[in-house]
């Protein structure tokens, strides 16, 4: 119904963003809302997908079309709902997920919250050969670049975002120690690093 929404980014929360367009504020669930941080109070285009349930109409949003397409592919897999698909895309780029699928790397897929061996195998069975990998070496899963020292407010926001993705306080306590030894320019960077540590 909504291919994308173009408007002003007015709110940034661990699980969603709010975009105001034509006087209406759209609450949009995102894999990692802090990817939109640089657009705060500025115009942004969010690629969206509306999912209607018996009890709710939920709008999901993505930083680009590739991320949206990967989300739509994932939720077609038996056992994968929107929440699990968002958790996967919060923890990894669409291309890394595609590479894991094509390489039948079940171990990589089971590192995401809520994805067990059976579901990981189902993802591979359903999507292998149906996803387009970008021009990279498909024998490797790419890692996100990280930085070096700590910033408490950023780390605090990042931990809230990770908790919203379904990670336990016990897991986050371990990650917090590692994050505190590094520094980050943005919450997005800290979230990405935290996700790397959690799925390592």
Swiss-Prot record:
Residues 1-63 are annotated as: Domain I. InterPro entries: DNA_helicase_Holl-junc_RuvA_I (IPR013849), Hlx-hairpin-Hlx_DNA-bd_motif (IPR003583), NA-bd_OB-fold (IPR012340), RuvA (IPR000085), RuvA_2-like (IPR010994), RuvA_C (IPR011114), RuvA_C_sf (IPR036267). The keyword Mitochondrion does not apply. One of its GO terms (molecular function) is four-way junction DNA binding. One of its GO terms (cellular component) is cytoplasm. It is found in: Cytoplasm. Keywords: Cytoplasm, DNA damage, DNA recombination, DNA repair, DNA-binding. Residues 150-200 are annotated as: Domain III. CDD domains: UBA_RuvA_C (cd14332). Residues 64-142 are annotated as: Domain II. GO terms for biological process: DNA recombination; DNA repair. Residues 143-149 are annotated as: Flexible linker. The keyword Cytoplasm applies. Belongs to the RuvA family. Has three domains with a flexible linker between the domains II and III and assumes an 'L' shape. Domain III is highly mobile and contacts RuvB. Homotetramer. Forms an RuvA(8)-RuvB(12)-Holliday junction (HJ) complex. HJ DNA is sandwiched between 2 RuvA tetramers; dsDNA enters through RuvA and exits via RuvB. An RuvB hexamer assembles on each DNA strand where it exits the tetramer. Each RuvB hexamer is contacted by two RuvA subunits (via domain III) on 2 adjacent RuvB subunits; this complex drives branch migration. In the full resolvosome a probable DNA-RuvA(4)-RuvB(12)-RuvC(2) complex forms which resolves the HJ. The RuvA-RuvB-RuvC complex processes Holliday junction (HJ) DNA during genetic recombination and DNA repair, while the RuvA-RuvB complex plays an important role in the rescue of blocked DNA replication forks via replication fork reversal (RFR). RuvA specifically binds to HJ cruciform DNA, conferring on it an open structure. The RuvB hexamer acts as an ATP-dependent pump, pulling dsDNA into and through the RuvAB complex. HJ branch migration allows RuvC to scan DNA until it finds its consensus sequence, where it cleaves and resolves the cruciform DNA. This is Holliday junction branch migration complex subunit RuvA. It comes from Staphylococcus saprophyticus subsp. saprophyticus (strain ATCC 15305 / DSM 20229 / NCIMB 8711 / NCTC 7292 / S-41). The gene is ruvA.
């Amino acid at each position: 119904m909504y291919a994308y929404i173009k408007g002003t980014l007015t709110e940034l929360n661990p699980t969603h963003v709010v975009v105001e367009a034509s006087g209406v504020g759209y609450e949009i669930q995102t894999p990692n809302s802090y990817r939109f941080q640089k657009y705060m109070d500025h115009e942004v285009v969010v690629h969206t997908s509306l999912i209607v349930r018996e009890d709710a109409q939920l709008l999901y949003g993505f930083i680009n079309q590739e991320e949206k397409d990967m989300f739509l592919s994932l939720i077609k897999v038996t056992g994968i709902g929107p929440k699990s698909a968002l958790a996967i895309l919060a923890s990894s780029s669409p291309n890394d997920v595609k590479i894991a699928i094509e390489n039948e790397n079940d171990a990589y897929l089971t590192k995401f919250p809520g994805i067990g061996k059976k579901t990981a195998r189902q993802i591979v069975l359903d999507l292998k050969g149906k996803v387009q990998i970008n021009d990279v070496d498909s024998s490797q899963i790419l890692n996100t670049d990280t930085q070096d020292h700590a910033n408490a407010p950023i780390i605090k926001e990042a931990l809230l975002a990770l908790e919203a993705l379904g990670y336990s306080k016990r897991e986050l306590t371990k990650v917090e120690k590692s994050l505190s030894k590094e520094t980050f320019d943005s919450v997005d960077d800290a979230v990405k690093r935290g996700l790397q540590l959690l799925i390592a």
